Design a protein with these regions (language model features):
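Membrane-interfacial amphipathic/re-entrant helices at transmembrane-helix boundaries
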Residues: 2-60, 95-110
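Single transmembrane alpha-helix segments in multi-pass membrane proteins
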Residues: 31-35, 39-93, 128-135, 272-282, ...
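Inter-helical junctions in multi-pass inner-membrane proteins, predominant
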Residues: 37-51, 153, 197, 203, ...
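Alpha-helical transmembrane segments within multi-pass membrane transporters and channels
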Residues: 94-145, 287-288
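Transmembrane helix-bundle core of multi-pass membrane transporters
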Residues: 133, 137-200, 226-229, 247-258, ...
């Protein structure tokens, strides 16, 4: 009986330790919700989940990289580049300051396909550099981050792009059975990722590489091809998120989505995706993104200066990764 109590006590302590950040953030959110009833209002929650939807898609893209002990620091800049491209392709005809005055406005579906295809090429470059040139993902994607930002600056001249077609922007405002289309898109993406991670050979290979890359290669896993697919898929998600962000904002600039990669990495880590590889789930990523976004909105309701918000976010990232490393060392 005493042994059972000790075991249960250890299990509870371990659970609290592993989920300390989530519990702390939820507690802060609850307190803010009690102090400010508008926090849990329908309008605020809808806006929150719209933001979560876009962040979730980016985090899902990065999750595959993290599970294979990699990373993708080009996420934010690539999403911003995608947003700028989407805005250029979706600008209304005859708009003042139109990027390409003689270009017809493209259909929304064509805009998405074209932007995602361009991002896929960038993801292919990342995958090739990481898998074949053996460059550390951190360095490879950091370099690509700067390359993409530079291309975006040269291409747009640093000029904000707006005057978008209503068919394109309505994607962010339309609803299906009362639920915003953005949320439906994120749900469809999440279901596809869950199936990919849990029911396909690619998912099994991905977790095997994250657990022990050398052993996976000996077992016959094509490590190079798997990693390339992961980085291509990640970039496609950044492209999709960039298009949705452009539709939601009604425009874009070179600074759109800046820093989103750090938020996504933090959300993944909070949601149980291990930076040491081999561990991570699609629902866990959703929990991480939701908790992280709730914290940011709660800080805004508390009238915390935006400068201090960055400090809090940075501390959360450090603590989340530290806890993840601690769990990894405990297993060893």
């Amino acid at each position: 009986m005493e042994a059972t109590k000790k075991l249960n006590g250890k299990a509870v302590t371990k659970w609290l330790s592993n989920n300390a950040i989530i519990m702390m953030m939820l507690a802060i959110t609850l307190i803010v919700g009690i102090m400010h009833p508008n926090f849990f209002s329908g309008t605020n929650m809808i806006n929150l989940f719209k933001n979560v939807s876009i962040r979730y898609i980016i985090a899902l893209g990065i999750s595959g990289c993290l599970i294979t002990t990699g990373n993708d620091l080009s996420a934010g800049r690539l999403a911003g580049f995608a947003a700028c491209l989407a805005c250029i392709f979706a600008q209304t005809e005859g708009a003042s300051g139109k990027f390409y005055p003689n270009m017809h406005t493209m259909p929304t579906l064509v805009v998405f396909i074209l932007v995602i295809a361009i991002c896929a090429i960038i993801g292919l470059c990342n995958g090739l550099v990481v898998s074949y040139l053996k460059v550390q993902p951190f360095i490879a994607t950091l370099g690509m981050q700067q390359v993409v930002y530079g291309i975006c600056l040269v291409y747009t001249g640093g000029t904000p792009i707006g005057s978008l077609n209503k068919n394109f922007t309505s994607l962010a405002s339309n609803t299906i059975i009362g639920i915003p289309v953005l949320i439906w898109i994120a749900l469809v993406v999440a279901v596809c990722f869950w199936f990919l991670y849990n029911k396909t050979r690619h998912g099994k290979y991905m977790y095997a590489i994250g657990g022990n890359e050398a052993a996976a290669e000996v077992a016959g896993v094509n490590v190079h091809a798997t990693k390339i697919r992961i980085y291509i898929l990640a970039s496609c998600m950044f492209g999709l998120a960039g298009c949705l962000l452009a539709a939601k904002s009604g425009g874009a600039s070179v600074n759109t989505a800046m820093g989103y990669e750090l938020d996504a990495i933090a959300a993944c880590t909070i949601g149980g995706v291990s930076t040491t590889g081999g561990v991570g789930t699609v629902p866990g990523v959703l929990v991480g993104v939701l908790v992280f976004e709730l914290m940011k909105v709660a800080l805004q309701f508390m009238n915390v200066n935006s400068s201090y918000t960055y400090i809090v976010q940075g501390l959360v990232i450090i603590v989340a990764v530290a806890i993840d490393i601690r769990k990894y060392l405990a297993k060893k």
